């Protein structure tokens, strides 16, 4: 199914406009790191958001590329956060190491 105004496919992953609600996206990135730390008993430190994409599913899936500090080593992870505003739900779906910086 296509969204004719935006020219995108519903359900497709699309880049988030860098100027669109930066604080909300950064908040989701920090949430992802905090949740991963809680789930894995780690102490990764959020450094910065490197990229963000979004996908409309049964809610919104945010695909976030984040840089974190793991002791003296900076690492890049891809996080997926599911958000369902009508259920007041925010859930970390995955948090995968991509590479060291």
UniProtKB/Swiss-Prot annotation:
Q: Where is the Cystatin domain?
A: 11-99
**Residues carrying N-acetylalanine:** 2
Pfam families for the chain? SQAPI
Decide whether keyword Protein transport is in the record: no
Query: Per the database entry, which stretches of residues form a coiled coil?
Result: none
Q: Which SUPFAM superfamilies match?
A: Cystatin/monellin (SSF54403)
Q: Name one GO molecular function term.
A: cysteine-type endopeptidase inhibitor activity
> Which residues does the UniProt site feature Reactive site point to?
11
InterPro entries, alphabetically? Cystatin (IPR027214), Cystatin_dom (IPR000010), Cystatin_sf (IPR046350), Prot_inh_cystat_CS (IPR018073)
Q: Where is this motif: Secondary area of contact?
A: 55-59
Domain of life of the native organism? Eukaryota
Tissue expression pattern: Expressed in roots and developing siliques.
- What family does the entry list? Belongs to the cystatin family. Phytocystatin subfamily.
* Stated role: Involved in suppression of hypersensitive cell death activated by either avirulent pathogen or oxidative stress.
Name assigned to this protein: Cysteine proteinase inhibitor 1
Q: Show the taxonomic lineage.
A: Eukaryota, Viridiplantae, Streptophyta, Embryophyta, Tracheophyta
